[in-house]
C-alpha cells in the first residue's frame, strides 16, 4: 500500500514538472495545473507516511500558487507543509511555516484564517517553547481584537497570561491580566472581571508589590457588583493578612473554594503565597489569659528577690 502511494506521488510530481516546462509553443508555465499536481503528490506521500516528501511537495505547491498570485492557496500549502514538519516532530520549523502562512492570510484579507493558524501554531509549540507560544497567542489576540472579535481575543490573552504565570514572568503576566480585565469590562462580563482581579492580586503579591495589589482592588470598586461580592471580601481579607504578616489568615483565604477552583496556574499561586518575613501564627484564645498569670509570676519573683536577704 505504502509503495503504491509513493509511486502515485512520484507520478504526480512528474506531471507537475511537465506543466512547468516551457517550449516553442508554450511560453508560460501552467502554475495552476502544476500546483494541483503537487497537492495530489503531497496527499499521496502523506498517506504513505513519507512526511519529508509530502512537505517538499507542499512547498512546491505553495511556490506554484505564489507564482500564480493565488495567495490564499499558497498560504494553505505552507500551512500543510508545517503540519508535515509537525508529524516529523520538527516543531520550531513547523511553527515558522505556519507563521508565514498566517501573514499571507492577512495579506489576502482573511484575518480569521490567519488567527486560527497562529493559534494552532501556539498549541504546537506550547510545551516546547512557552515563550514563543505566548508571542503567538498575543499575535492571535491582536488579530481578533482588530476584527472586533473581543471574546476570541480575550480567550487567547488568557492563554498567554497563564503561560506567563507558569513561567513566573510576573511583570508581563500582570500587564496581560490587566488587558484581559479591560476587555471583560468592555463586554460587560463583570463576574469574570472579579476573577481577574483575584489573579492580578496574587501575581502582584508574588512580585512582592503590595501597593499594586491593593490598587487593583481599589480600582475594581468601580466595577458594577464588585463591592460587596465574595471576591471583594476575600481579597480584602487576603490583603489584611498579608499586610499584618499573618500567614494563617492568608493561607485560610487561599485555601478557600473561591481560590482553589480558579484556573490551576492561579490556584497554585495562592497555595504557594508566603507573607513577608515568613509570617506569624495567629494567637490562640488561651494566650491572652496566660499573659496576666505570667506577669504576676514575674512580679512575685521580683518581690522575693527584693527581700531574699531577710528583714534587718
Curated annotation (Swiss-Prot):
CDD domains hit by this protein: SNAP
Superkingdom of source: Eukaryota
Subcellular location per the Swiss-Prot or TrEMBL entry: Membrane; Golgi apparatus
Keyword Signal assigned: no
Region (Disordered): 281-312
Tissue: Abundantly expressed in the heart, liver and kidneys with lower expression in the brain, spleen, lung, muscle and testes.
Extent of Acidic residues compositional bias: 300-312
SUPFAM superfamilies registered for this protein in UniProt: TPR-like
In-chain residues carrying the UniProt-annotated modification Phosphoserine: 284, 308
Gene Ontology terms: biological process: intracellular protein transport; vesicle-mediated transport
Membrane topology: Peripheral membrane protein
GO cellular component, as recorded: Golgi apparatus; membrane; mitochondrion; myelin sheath; synapse
Chief location bin: membrane
Alphabetized InterPro entries for the sequence: NSF_attach (IPR000744), TPR-like_helical_dom_sf (IPR011990)
Entry's family note: Belongs to the SNAP family.
Subunit structure: Interacts with RAB11FIP5. Interacts with VTI1A.
Function, as annotated: Required for vesicular transport between the endoplasmic reticulum and the Golgi apparatus.
The protein, known as: Gamma-soluble NSF attachment protein
Amino acid at each position: 500500500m505504502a509503495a503504491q502511494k509513493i509511486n502515485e506521488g512520484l507520478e504526480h510530481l512528474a506531471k507537475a514538472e511537465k506543466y512547468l516546462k516551457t517550449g516553442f509553443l508554450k511560453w508560460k508555465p501552467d502554475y495552476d495545473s502544476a500546483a494541483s499536481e503537487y497537492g495530489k503528490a503531497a496527499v499521496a506521500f502523506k498517506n504513505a507516511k513519507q512526511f519529508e516528501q509530502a512537505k517538499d511537495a507542499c512547498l512546491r505547491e505553495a511556490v506554484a500558487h505564489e507564482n500564480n498570485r493565488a495567495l490564499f492557496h499558497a498560504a494553505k500549502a505552507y500551512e500543510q507543509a508545517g503540519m508535515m514538519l509537525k508529524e516529523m516532530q520538527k516543531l520550531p520549523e513547523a511553527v515558522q511555516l505556519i507563521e508565514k502562512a498566517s501573514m499571507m492570510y492577512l495579506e489576502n484579507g482573511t484575518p480569521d484564517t490567519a488567527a486560527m493558524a497562529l493559534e494552532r501554531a501556539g498549541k504546537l509549540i506550547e510545551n516546547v517553547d512557552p515563550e514563543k507560544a505566548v508571542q503567538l497567542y498575543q499575535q492571535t489576540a491582536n488579530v481578533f481584537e482588530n476584527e472586533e472579535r473581543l471574546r476570541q481575543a480575550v480567550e487567547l490573552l488568557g492563554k498567554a497570561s497563564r503561560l506567563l504565570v507558569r513561567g513566573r514572568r510576573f511583570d508581563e503576566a500582570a500587564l496581560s491580566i490587566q488587558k484581559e480585565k479591560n476587555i471583560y469590562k468592555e463586554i460587560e462580563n463583570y463576574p469574570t472581571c472579579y476573577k481577574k482581579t483575584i489573579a492580578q492580586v496574587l501575581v502582584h503579591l508574588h512580585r512582592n508589590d503590595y501597593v499594586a495589589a491593593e490598587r487593583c482592588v481599589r480600582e475594581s470598586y468601580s466595577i458594577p457588583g464588585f463591592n460587596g461580592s465574595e471576591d471583594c471580601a476575600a481579597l480584602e481579607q487576603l490583603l489584611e493578612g498579608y499586610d499584618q504578616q499573618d500567614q494563617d489568615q492568608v493561607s485560610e483565604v487561599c485555601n478557600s473554594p473561591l481560590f482553589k477552583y480558579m484556573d490551576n496556574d492561579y490556584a497554585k499561586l495562592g497555595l504557594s503565597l508566603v507573607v513577608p518575613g515568613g509570617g506569624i501564627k495567629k494567637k490562640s484564645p488561651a494566650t491572652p489569659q496566660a499573659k496576666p498569670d505570667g506577669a504576676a509570676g514575674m512580679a512575685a519573683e521580683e518581690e522575693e528577690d527584693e527581700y531574699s536577704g531577710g528583714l534587718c
